[in-house]
Curated annotation (Swiss-Prot):
Gene of this entry: rplI
Lineage: Bacteria, Pseudomonadati, Pseudomonadota, Alphaproteobacteria, Hyphomicrobiales
Primary role: Binds to the 23S rRNA.
HAMAP family: Ribosomal_bL9 (MF_00503)
Gene Ontology biological process terms from the UniProt entry: translation
Source organism superkingdom: Bacteria
Keyword 4Fe-4S: no
MF annotations from Gene Ontology: rRNA binding; structural constituent of ribosome
Ranges of compositional bias, category Acidic residues: 181-196
Name of the featured protein: Large ribosomal subunit protein bL9
Region of interest (Disordered), ranges: 172-196
Organism: Chelativorans sp. (strain BNC1)
Family indicated by similarity: Belongs to the bacterial ribosomal protein bL9 family.
Length: 196
């Protein structure tokens, strides 16, 4: 189906372009969301008569998005999740979770504006792109951690890949696996028992 784009669509075209797309994509997304019109003579005339108004509205939305992007770009958000000792999350951080965290700070974004290829499944610092407008993208940093203290330490640049780094110096020395499974100590004990 041929459609006339009413706004810039990534990987498809600019406003006013006549493009051929699959029927389902046109009916279920472009036409339903008001992002395109069917490309027939009546709609082409209608688009040309409203082109100046559409371009002005698009420019206004773009300037609003740029104002929000200036406030949002480079901000850091903390996401607290439970995770294994290896840093793998029990679950994941999805686009919806990211949108909720950013919205809790007072920014209005939807989950469809968060651009991640796949859910985030490990703790650490992650950069995420947020498309506020087809031509305006802001980048935020997610600090994914097990606790607020751990998030603070990650933000300072500490690596949290060992038990000492995660739990600090207060680790019980007798709880170390080497103390339980020292094969040399077992051999010495057996030799001492045999000699007695």
């Amino acid at each position: 189906m041929e459609v006339i784009l009413l706004e810039r669509i990534p990987r498809l075209g600019q406003m006013g372009d006549v493009v051929r797309v699959k029927d389902g994509f046109a009916r279920n997304f472009l036409l339903r969301q008001g992002k395109a019109l069917r490309a027939n003579d009546a709609n082409r005339k209608k688009f040309e008569s409203q082109r100046v108004e559409l371009e002005a509205r698009n420019l206004e939305r773009k300037s609003e998005a740029q104002a929000v992007a200036e406030k949002l770009d480079g901000k850091s958000f903390v996401v607290i999740r439970s995770a294994a000792e290896t840093g793998q999350l029990y679950g994941s951080v999805s686009a919806r979770d990211i949108a909720d965290v950013v919205a809790s700070e007072g920014f209005k974004i939807g989950r469809n504006q968060v651009d991640i290829n796949q859910p985030i499944k490990t703790i650490g610092l992650t950069n995420v792109a947020i498309a506020l407008h087809p031509e305006v993208v802001a980048t935020v940093t997610l600090n994914i951690a097990r606790s607020a203290d751990e998030a603070e330490r990650q933000a300072r640049g500490e690596t949290l890949d060992s038990a000492e780094a995660i739990y600090g110096e207060e680790i019980n020395e007798s709880a170390r696996p080497e103390a339980f499974f020292d094969p040399e100590a077992e051999i010495e004990q057996e030799e001492g028992e045999e000699n007695a």
